[in-house]
C-alpha cells in the first residue's frame, strides 16, 4: 500500500447535506428550520442560558463564597521518596532539583510531600514542606529549612 492508495474506512465518512437544494433532497425550501420564528431567521436564536424571559437559573441561585484563584500559589511537587537518589549530606535546593530534571519548572516554589521513604541524611531547603515529610527527613538524620 502506498500513500496515494489510502482510503477512509467504509461508512466512516458521510456526504455533507446540502440544505435548501430542492424538494427532492429532503432539506429543500425551509432547509430543516421549520416555518418562520426567531430560529428560522439568519443569525437567529437565543443566547446560551436564555430561558424565554423567565429568570434564568444563574440569576435565581445566590452568589456564594469567594475565590482567590488569580493569586493562588502553585507549587511544583516532589515527594520524600524521590530524594533518595541524592548522596548523604547533599543540600537539596529548588535549583538542584531543576538541574536534575526532577521538576519541570519552579512555578511559585517547590513543596515537599511525604510519599515514599528516605534513608539518607539530607539538608532540604525548599519553599514548603509538609509536617509528615519534615518528620521523615529528621528521622533519617537530615535537616529541613523552609525558604
From Swiss-Prot:
Gene3D superfamilies: 3.100.10.10. The keyword RNA-binding applies. The keyword Ribosomal protein applies. Residues 21-31, 42-52 have a biased composition (Gly residues). Residues 1-65 are annotated as: Disordered. Pfam families: Ribosomal_L27A. It comes from the Bacteria. GO terms for cellular component: cytosolic large ribosomal subunit. One of its GO terms (biological process) is translation. One of its GO terms (molecular function) is rRNA binding. Keywords: Ribonucleoprotein, Ribosomal protein, RNA-binding, rRNA-binding. Belongs to the universal ribosomal protein uL15 family. Part of the 50S ribosomal subunit. PANTHER family: 50S RIBOSOMAL PROTEIN L15, LARGE RIBOSOMAL SUBUNIT PROTEIN UL15M. Binds to the 23S rRNA. This is Large ribosomal subunit protein uL15. It comes from Heliobacterium modesticaldum (strain ATCC 51547 / Ice1). The gene is rplO.
